């Protein structure tokens, strides 16, 4: 029973100067698994990425610690910034971010208002440049998509976009994502978008990738809403192969549906577990308004829809079957966005201010990369979703011990510890700059 007049204990103020790394210090935490990501962050020079991006910081909470605090919420399946208060007294998580304790919700909210789109773009560029050699060294194809993040408050000042989960348009903040096709890693995002910016976003991603690698992407897959025909023409002029969907007009459908059966060629999609594999394809070359030159159109029956599906591509050497099979892989970006909504809580809108949301979206990209890296390291879990990885590995209690020349994380006994031991995530872990250049070591009972 609470004593009369007793008050709740007040947590300490986040201050990097109060972080103690004295040998012998031992900190208990119920989510010691978050330290599994430290070797990756140290190897990728995360602190240097933050400095190069120019994020603001203070004497109490440097920029690196502020961004690590925001990233921690994403890694720990927390819906809102206010949920950081769940860890007010978890000094081990403060140590993870280079602080004595994690900042409060008011700091994180205020901090996001101090950032600019240039900060996020520079950070994403550095992040992808360092992550690519580890997860997608031969990146060639990307799936692109818009995702409207619904707003449930006063809709004044916000544009209305179609919300698939509601089946109607509503006030929302529009975000854009690009995902590398094979690794399923999110590699670009932008939430500082208006409806006027929407048509040119595909080319902005192409420019982003060109700046990173010195060449344009080889293949892009996206639906009909992402780029008008004039933007498709610009992609063609830059020799970027694309496959997209064409909107179906009534007159166009009538013409195609009256074609004789001999015009339709059979094809089989070699995709395991796909329900509709046997197709019939009519392949033709057409011209479109605002598109310079010929373009290839594929009319397809057998995809499980009542009417034809129309594909457009500027690639002529590939077979029609291969183009459709390439586009079928675009479902991965929709799956990835579904994961971002369910685990990284993308739809829990941080604010009605787009720049504020842009920070949250950038943290989603970083958290996605962290979990894809973790999945790649664990034998048998390379295709595991973040929620599964979190439940089996990250959501593990443990003891963080500071020793003379290293930080040791002692994990509690769990059934999946042998998989972590086999992965040896801490092998050759570089010094962690925001922890006095101490390396991290993991031990398992």
Q: Model segments located where?
A:
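Acidic/polar loop patches that form or flank catalytic/metal-binding clefts of enzymes
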Residues: 217, 243-245, 335-338, 349, ...
């Amino acid at each position: 029973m609470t004593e009369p007049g007793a008050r709740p204990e007040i947590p300490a103020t986040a201050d990097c100067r109060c972080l103690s790394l004295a040998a012998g210090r031992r900190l208990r935490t119920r989510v010691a698994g978050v330290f599994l990501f430290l070797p990756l962050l140290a190897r990728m020079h995360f602190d240097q990425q933050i400095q190069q991006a120019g994020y603001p910081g203070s004497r109490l909470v440097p920029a690196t610690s502020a961004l690590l605090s925001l990233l921690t919420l994403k890694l720990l399946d927390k819906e809102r910034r206010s949920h950081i208060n769940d860890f007010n007294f978890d000094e081990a998580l403060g140590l993870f971010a280079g602080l004595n304790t994690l900042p409060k919700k008011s700091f994180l909210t205020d901090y996001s208002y101090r950032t600019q789109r240039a900060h996020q773009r520079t950070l994403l560029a550095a992040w992808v440049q360092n992550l690519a050699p580890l997860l997608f060294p031969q990146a060639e194809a990307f799936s692109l998509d818009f995702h409207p993040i619904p707003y449930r408050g006063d809709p004044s000042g916000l544009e209305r976009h179609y919300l698939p989960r509601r089946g109607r348009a509503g006030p929302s903040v529009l975000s854009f994502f690009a995902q590398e096709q094979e690794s399923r890693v999110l590699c670009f995002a932008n939430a500082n978008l208006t409806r006027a910016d929407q048509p040119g976003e595909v080319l902005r991603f192409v420019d982003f990738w060109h700046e990173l690698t010195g060449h344009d992407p080889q293949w892009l897959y996206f639906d009909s809403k992402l780029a008008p025909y004039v933007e498709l023409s610009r992609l063609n002029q830059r020799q970027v192969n694309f496959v997209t969907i064409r909107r179906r007009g009534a007159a166009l459908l009538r013409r195609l549906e009256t074609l004789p059966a001999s015009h339709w060629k059979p094809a089989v999609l070699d995709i395991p577990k796909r329900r509709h594999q046997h197709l019939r394809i009519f392949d033709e070359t057409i011209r479109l308004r605002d598109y310079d030159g010929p373009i290839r159109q594929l009319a397809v029956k057998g995809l499980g829809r009542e009417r034809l599906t129309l594909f457009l591509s500027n690639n002529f050497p590939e077979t029609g079957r291969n183009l459709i099979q390439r586009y079928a892989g675009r479902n991965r970006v929709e799956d990835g966005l579904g994961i971002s909504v369910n685990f990284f809580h993308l739809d829990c809108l941080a604010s009605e201010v787009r720049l504020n949301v842009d920070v949250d979206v950038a943290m989603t990209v970083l958290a996605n990369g962290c979990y894809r890296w973790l999945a790649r390291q664990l034998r048998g879990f390379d295709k595991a979703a973040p929620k599964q990885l979190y439940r089996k590995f990250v959501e593990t209690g443990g003891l963080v011990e500071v020793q003379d020349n290293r930080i040791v994380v002692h994990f509690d006994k769990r059934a999946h510890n042998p998989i972590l031991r086999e992965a040896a995530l801490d092998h050759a872990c570089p010094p962690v700059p925001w922890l006095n250049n101490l390396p991290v070591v993991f031990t398992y009972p």
